[in-house]
């Protein structure tokens, strides 16, 4: 299905002409620090795509604050507005993590650090490997059933209930498992939630995660390109992080390149690719905005819900 009927379509050349009052707010050095492995996001993307997008998010943030203030004044209540939540979804290897870090840094700069912006990934809400193994779904890691949805729902509810301190479980891509420790965020103004599953809906639940979001973004690309980027990233990690003997994937540095490629292709064809087609891709039209990437990693088209 290709249903963009309820979206405005902005080709890159049209989007980049949107007026933004602020100058470039990231340097090349800062971008290099937050860029993910094999993610070729450039300063050109920052100025032409992300700066207009950050302005749009800022407009919606201020509108939400204004409406809340008007409502509280009318109701004669005194309660601060719950955090403004931005959701960022998309496939493995499409560039979500880098984009989420770009959002955080640019929002910090846009508001001159007068707003507390927090970044949360949904990886921490996966069940620990031990639980996945006990349930026989280790090969479904990343699928909806591999997430502790009750814990994620409580996290979102706590945020929207204006709870002062909200606990976030942490995940290590090094050990490929949920960590024992957690992180606490205190009274955030804006929260960016990044993960493959953030726009997924469970028909058996009374609340969907999207019920809590103020703005949602889906990062899209052709599956063949995403698969290629996934394989490239796997081999980059094989030469770097996987070399550490403590890494979960260290054994794959001891086999031949051809064997490693067979393994990585198998993971894509039986797990990541299947999850993309069955669960992730269908959430695209729930997003407020879709960023379409081309083969060269550059954003080619933007779709904004009307």
From Swiss-Prot:
Q: What is its EC number?
A: 2.7.1.33
Q: Which domain of life is it from?
A: Bacteria
Among the GO biological process terms of this entry, one is: coenzyme A biosynthetic process
The UniProt GO MF terms for this protein read:
ATP binding; pantothenate kinase activity
Q: Give the family this protein belongs to, as stated in its UniProt record.
A: Belongs to the prokaryotic pantothenate kinase family.
Instruction: Cite the NCBIfam families for this sequence.
Output: panK_bact
By what name is this protein known? Pantothenate kinase
Natural source organism: Listeria monocytogenes serovar 1/2a (strain ATCC BAA-679 / EGD-e)
Taxonomically, what lineage is the organism? Answer: Bacteria, Bacillati, Bacillota, Bacilli, Bacillales
